[in-house]
Curated annotation (Swiss-Prot):
It comes from the Eukaryota. This is 1-acylglycerol-3-phosphate O-acyltransferase ICT1. It comes from Saccharomyces cerevisiae (strain ATCC 204508 / S288c). The keyword DNA damage does not apply. Lysophosphatidic acid acyltransferase involved in membrane remodeling leading to increased organic solvent tolerance. Involved in resistance to azoles and copper. It is an enzyme of class 2 (transferase). The isooctane tolerance of organic-solvent tolerant strain KK-21 may result from the alteration of the expression of several genes including ICT1, due to the loss of their proper regulation. Keywords: Acyltransferase, Lipid biosynthesis, Lipid metabolism, Phospholipid biosynthesis, Phospholipid metabolism, Stress response, Transferase. One of its GO terms (cellular component) is mitochondrial inner membrane. One of its GO terms (biological process) is cardiolipin acyl-chain remodeling. Its EC number is 2.3.1.51. InterPro entries: AB_hydrolase_1, AB_hydrolase_fold. Residues 74-381 form the AB hydrolase-1 domain. The HXXXXD motif is essential for acyltransferase activity and may constitute the binding site for the phosphate moiety of the glycerol-3-phosphate.
Amino acid sequence: MWTNTFKWCSKTEKETTTADAKVCASVQGLKALQQQIMDSTTVRGSVNNTMTPGGINQWHFHNKRANKVCTPTVLIHGYAASSMAFYRTFENLSDNIKDLYAIDLPANGASEAPALQVNKTKKIKSLRFKHIEDDVVIPVIEKRPPAEDIKSHLEQYESYFVDRIEQWRKDNKLRKINVVGHSFGGYISFKYALKYPDSIEKLCLISPLGVENSIHAITHKWEPNTTYPLTFTDPSSRYYTRKLNVPRFIFENQLNVLKWMGPIGSKLCSNYISTAYVKVPDQIYKDYLLHSFVGKNQTVQPQTIKVFTHLFERNLIARDPIINNVRFLNPATPVMFMYGEHDWMDKYAGYLTTESMLKNKAKASYVEVPDAGHNLFLDNPQHFASSLVSFLSK
């Protein structure tokens, strides 16, 4: 792992391997593309782009006149995204937050991609069962190890991101921080709050992945050859599941599949971006996404894919879901769940989790952003920023 990307990238060609040179070129390319977006973005106060000693690419917005939110606040992007996902909110947020940070997670965007080091353990196998109409039979074969062993194994993968977020906080010499995480970044942010409760002031989970309870949750015990009733509508139930699974080949290879398809993959990706980001007016951001998804500057590195495929099932349900762990959060930490009005993520799961926390006297709230989908900060940046600042400033 190199400690300073600019210094590392300044090595002569003889001093780097071919693989290193490709990674370096990718980092430089993504940083250049990010700079193009930032050059067209209005912010309040100063903006500074640096690589931390821990290898995190960060954008720091400092506005000494902002007085609504004085606690340093970090924005953590979702899967196959980067710090630029929040670019449409930078103006409004930097107007109200004294110190705002947007970072690229490790092995994402222009951040370094350190090796993923985990103890050699047999890969966790998905629960195998058989559907009988609306019921399910849990078979005897391949019984799972104890839940504690699985959880310990999963935590090794979570720590790849969680521990580096904590190191990022220390590198910036910050005390308590507000953490705002979207989708996969919301799941990681939640796990960060569990592991480092003293580092968190407030936690905002934006359309987080991995909230739902399910038959796949590692804490559930099942009797072999026993029939259980399934539910496809109650994401708080241990009997919950989803019918659709991502094909295994696509799940395990993800964006690489598009790259392997050549021009056809690029065309499919371009069509997807045009449809999914129809509310985003700036072509420069859409071009950035295309480069990130299928270009030589692909934002998602193998480490991220490996972590993702260990933490989640092929139906995108978490093996250690948020709803089953909220009781372990510091009850004094305010938490807000935020979704888009037309979000494809399971809003009901977030609502039920909020209700559960409130019943247990925790500080929780639930908000929906109108006229917005899963990327609510891109679809309705003004309302998103207003809701976030309102939560953080209370």
